[in-house]
């Protein structure tokens, strides 16, 4: 393959994308050459003089590149995308973050509402045709009990405006979680390595080394962090001991952030009240795992980001970053390769 004219940039796509999306990429590329590689051999030839790449880069492809400036990952998470040579390479790397923030935040609030109002328990009771308020039917409040009487049923149903929600990782997803929780009147706490505030919602985002404070204060602890070297197994037995025994853990980040055996032990012992889990250290979660049988655990099969809106957002992010590269600008989703985000 002949080299590109010096004035013309080249974008290589592999695996190939369909024609309607390719047409939009060509329009966004604004004079760039766009090669939609149908197979690995074509991609290996095409990467030699490519300036930009979208798709799954491999060590073999990267080694053949001679002028690569920018790589666009098709995913938001990078733990399975990065490799040492890519980290050391001078090219810029961007990901697909920001596509799922509102959707995942909705999923988190679903977990929160289920635990606060015992909806998961009532669903099981409904399937058994049982009328059984959590706290006991005999403990229902009556006017005869007099003013200021709080029943056992009342105590087993949380008032969200009295609860504190702690977010571990206040990035795009974490910020949306904070906004939704604030709308319910909850007190919000956050820890983040960058200490990004959420204006008008959370002004005091603390550094990650203050995680113990957040755990001690929170009624709901939400993991919204990506998998990075710093977050691998961040939650172990020690962190569960630091949580309130009445607190719930919610993980929509990455499964490997939580030591699954330690979490299981904390739930079995009553060290924490329950867990809402969308991601796991091992996926699918084995059918014989104890978590499946726990009434205080809600399991969803890695679907927190599922939405019919995601595909259009994915394409929009790609097109915007292609436009920016063609114009000599940084991508909007530029990442720090050494930090994985």
Predicted regions and their residues:
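Short, well-ordered coil/turn residues at beta-beta hairpins
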Residues: 14, 56, 74, 224-227, ...
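Rossmann-like adenosine-cofactor binding region
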Residues: 189, 193-290
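Structural alpha-helical scaffold elements that stabilize or flank donor/cofactor-binding regions
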Residues: 43-46, 61-64, 213-214, 239, ...
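N-terminal glycine-/charge-rich "phosphate-binding" loop or analogous flexible N-terminal tail
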Residues: 1-52, 326
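Oxidoreductase and adenylate-handling cofactor-binding alpha/beta cores
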Residues: 105-124, 182-186, 316-324, 329
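Rossmann-like dinucleotide-binding domain for NAD(H)/NADP(H)
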Residues: 246, 252-341
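Phosphate/diphosphate ligand-binding glycine-rich loop within oxidoreductases
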Residues: 49-138
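Glycine-rich NAD(P)-binding loop of Rossmann-like domains
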Residues: 123-176
């Amino acid at each position: 393959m002949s080299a590109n004219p010096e004035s013309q940039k080249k974008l290589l796509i592999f695996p190939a994308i369909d024609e309607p999306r390719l047409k939009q990429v060509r329009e966004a590329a604004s004079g760039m050459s766009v090669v939609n590689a149908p197979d690995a051999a074509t991609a290996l030839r095409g990467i030699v003089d490519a300036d930009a790449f979208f798709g799954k880069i491999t060590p073999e492809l990267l080694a053949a590149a001679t002028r690569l400036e920018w790589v666009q990952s098709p995913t938001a998470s990078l733990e399975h995308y990065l490799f040492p040579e890519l980290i050391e390479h001078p090219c810029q790397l961007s990901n697909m973050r920001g596509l799922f923030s509102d959707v995942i935040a909705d999923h988190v609030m679903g977990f929160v509402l289920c635990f606060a109002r015992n909806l998961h328990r009532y669903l099981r009771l409904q399937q058994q045709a049982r009328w059984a308020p959590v706290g006991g039917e005999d403990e229902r409040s009556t006017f005869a009990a007099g003013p200021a009487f709080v029943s056992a049923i009342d105590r087993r149903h949380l008032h969200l405006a009295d609860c504190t929600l702690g977010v571990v990782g206040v990035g795009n997803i974490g910020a949306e979680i904070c906004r939704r929780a604030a709308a319910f009147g909850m007190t919000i706490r956050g820890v983040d390595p960058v200490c990004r505030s959420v204006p008008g919602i959370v002004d005091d985002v603390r550094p990650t080394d203050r995680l113990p404070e957040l755990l001690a204060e929170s009624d709901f602890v939400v993991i919204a962090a990506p998998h990075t070297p710093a977050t691998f197994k961040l939650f172990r037995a020690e962190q569960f001991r630091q949580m309130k025994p009445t607190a719930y853990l919610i993980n929509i980040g990455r499964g490997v952030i939580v030591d699954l055996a330690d979490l299981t032990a904390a739930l079995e012992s009553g060290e924490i009240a329950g867990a809402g889990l969308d991601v796991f250290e091992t996926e699918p979660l084995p059918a014989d795992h104890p978590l499946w049988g726990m009434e205080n655990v809600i399991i969803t099969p890695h679907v927190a980001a599922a939405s019919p809106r995601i595909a259009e957002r994915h394409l929009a992010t790609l097109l915007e970053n292609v436009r920016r590269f063609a114009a000599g600008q940084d991508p909007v989703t530029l990442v720090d390769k050494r930090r994985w985000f």
